[in-house]
Amino acid sequence: MDTKALHTLTYGLYIITAKKGDRFNGQVANTVFQITSDPPTIAVSINKQNLTHEFIQAGQGFVISVLAREVPLSLIGQFGFKSGREMDKFAGINYKLSEGGLPYLADHTLAYLEASLNQTVDAGTHSIFIGTVTDAAVLLQGEPMTYAYYHQVKRGTTPKTAPTFTVGREKDKTALASPKYQCTICNYVYDPVQGDPEHGIAPGTPFADLPEDWTCPICGAGKDAFEQI
């Protein structure tokens, strides 16, 4: 079986948020889809190991923030490669509350949809949470971030708990003639040809010439967490 066929499927990139008691948590997800229009019903796939999974079950609802294409990698890193068990993911984040009191991102978000959980489907490592939309609004005009754009243009990577993660797929196989370095935490690849313009690193800057305080654009790891590939 050629599993590369799965790579032809298209996805978006979203922040899924939920509430448990007086605490908020959220994560990046790419498997979000509309099921029906009357009533408007949406679904999201969440790994059972993730804290957000626990929060959705406890709060019986969730919010989807539709990310804009221009979203910084650092925001994706905060919600996609860090655990809410170890930190407050909303620290330093500009967010607002939906009608149901659930958080959504106020910046870099085209729209949000709040859903009341009405069904959970067991999908092995993941649960598919199905909910009826109870609140929604368009916040910005623009192009949504897609999974393909995130990987091909932003050079982003996939958390191991994502439904689309494939072992070995995140390793860059580029020849060593143009040395690239890969983050051992989140698999981000620093390419000297492209640099890191978002953080002031010009294209053509070798990894060795990066400032000592430079950190991974996605997860924030230091240079010592990178290995040549």
Curated annotation (Swiss-Prot):
Which cofactor does this sequence's record say it needs? Answer: Fe cation; FMN
* Disulphide bridges: none
Task: Give an example GO molecular function.
Answer: FMN binding
Task: Give all residue intervals belonging to the Rubredoxin-like domain.
Answer: 178-229
Note accompanying the cofactor annotation:
Binds 2 iron ions per homodimer.
- Per the record's keyword annotation, is Iron included, yes or no? yes
Could you tell me which PROSITE patterns the record lists for this protein? RUBREDOXIN, RUBREDOXIN_LIKE
Give the binding site residues for Fe cation. 183, 186, 216, 219
Biological process GO annotation list? alkane catabolic process
Task: Give the InterPro entries listed for this entry.
Answer: Flavin_Rdtase-like_dom, Rubredoxin-like_dom, Rubredoxin_dom, Rubredoxin_ET, Rubredoxin_Fe_BS, Split_barrel_FMN-bd
Q: Return the Pfam families for the record.
A: Flavin_Reduct, Rubredoxin
Induction remark: Constitutively expressed.
- What does the UniProt keyword field contain? Electron transport, Flavoprotein, FMN, Iron, Metal-binding, Oxidoreductase, Transport
- Using the UniProt annotation, give all residue ranges assigned to the region (Flavodoxin-reductase-like): 1-158
Judging by the UniProt lineage, the source's domain of life is: Bacteria
- Summary of the function given for this chain in its UniProt record: Has nitric oxide reductase activity in combination with FprA; probably involved in nitrosative stress protection. Acts as an NADH:FprA oxidoreductase.
The text of the family note is: In the N-terminal section; belongs to the flavodoxin reductase family.
Protein name (Swiss-Prot/TrEMBL): High molecular weight rubredoxin
